[in-house]
Design a protein with these regions (language model features):
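Conserved hydrophobic beta-strands of the Rossmann-like cofactor-binding core
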Residues: 8-11, 86-87, 133
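The beta1-alpha1 cofactor-binding region of Rossmann-like NAD(H)/NADP(H)-dependent oxidoreductases
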Residues: 40, 60-75, 100
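A glycine-rich helix->loop->beta "capping" turn
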Residues: 52-56, 76-88, 94-99
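Conserved glycine-rich Rossmann-like NAD(P)H-binding loop of the short-chain dehydrogenase/reductase
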Residues: 29-45
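Canonical Rossmann dinucleotide-binding motif of NAD(H)/NADP(H)-dependent dehydrogenases/reductases
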Residues: 1-34
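C-terminal helical subdomain
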Residues: 168, 212-252, 260-265, 269, ...
Length: 285
């Protein structure tokens, strides 16, 4: 199957779990996959597996906890030319602390880093049109009732718990809606998704008990990649622009907060200011 031959697709966090499965499956369909990950050593087995299967893949170092590193990574990815799909898959949970630029760690890695990465690669994504931006969110975003801005920027520390993860996942959904308000789906289609309860390294910093329980009741990465792969490759007319998909690749209701256009725009403007990009990098809503 070479239905993606000639396409370049970028997958962040592709060295393990859902990201690895996503990268391998896309490469198997003929795409050249750029694996944007923190560490080459941990990504090399994926590169080797793709090569053995006859696929094409490249590595670019990406540290989403450092916006300067994100800029360097985006510059390197941009050298690959037009991008036909960007899959913002990388994420973390339960990691205390702050990013290099002083943002709450989970919010910085799960939202601000991907926001900047997408903005910097936007010319390449437009050059690949019709193209896609797929954001891996989580059902956890539905737990949030308010969005406490003071917890995200200018903090000195953070507990990095599950609540912070939920905030960051709501930000993923809000970002998806903001992007959908700015670009037509026949140019760049976008969607976000819940991959299911997947035993991945996102939760590698949980206690042994939580990891054990999670292992009992979760899907495999192969099952968890279903929605990511579907939204990245389904026919354009079938993808609902700006929608939130469940683990079975079905459109499902999102948190009502994510339907608040004022909140969508507030996050967009703050994210642009915090990452140093123009508010109109993707156009105006």
């Amino acid at each position: 199957m070479n239905i993606l031959k000639g396409k370049t697709m970028v997958v962040t966090g592709a060295n393990t779990g859902i990201g690895r499965v996503t990268a391998e499956k896309l490469a198997a369909q003929g795409a050249h996959v750029v694996l944007a990950c923190r560490d080459l050593g941990r990504t090399q087995p994926v590169l080797d597996a793709i090569a053995r299967a006859g696929g094409q893949a490249s590595f670019v170092a990406l540290d989403l906890a450092d916006l300067d590193a994100v800029r360097v990574a985006a510059e390197k990815v941009a050298r690959h030319g037009p991008i036909h799909a960007l899959i913002n898959n990388a994420g973390l949970a339960n990691v205390p602390g702050v990013t290099k630029q002083g943002f709450e760690m989970t919010f910085g890695v799960n939202h601000l880093g991907p926001y900047l990465f997408t903005a910097l690669l936007w010319p390449n994504i437009l050059a690949g049109a019709p193209s896609r931006v797929i954001n891996v969110a989580s059902r956890a975003h539905t737990r949030i009732k308010t969005f406490p801005w003071e917890q995200f920027q200018g903090v000195h520390t953070s507990p990095g718990g599950f609540q912070q993860y939920c905030y960051s996942k709501l930000a993923n959904v809000l970002f998806t809606r903001g992007l959908a308000r700015r670009v037509k789906p026949d140019v760049v289609a976008t969607a976000c998704l819940h991959p299911g309860g997947v035993a991945t390294e996102v939760f590698r910093n949980q206690t042994w008990l939580v990891r054990t329980i999670t292992g009992w009741f979760t899907m495999t990465p192969e099952q968890g990649a279903t929605s990511t792969l579907a939204t990245a490759t389904m026919p354009r007319e079938q993808l609902q622009h700006g929608a939130y998909y469940n683990e079975h690749a079905k459109v499902t209701p999102m948190n009502p907060l994510a339907l608040d256009d004022a909140l969508v725009e507030e996050l967009w403007k703050k994210s642009a200011a915090w990452t140093g990009v123009p508010e109109d990098w993707a156009g105006r809503p």
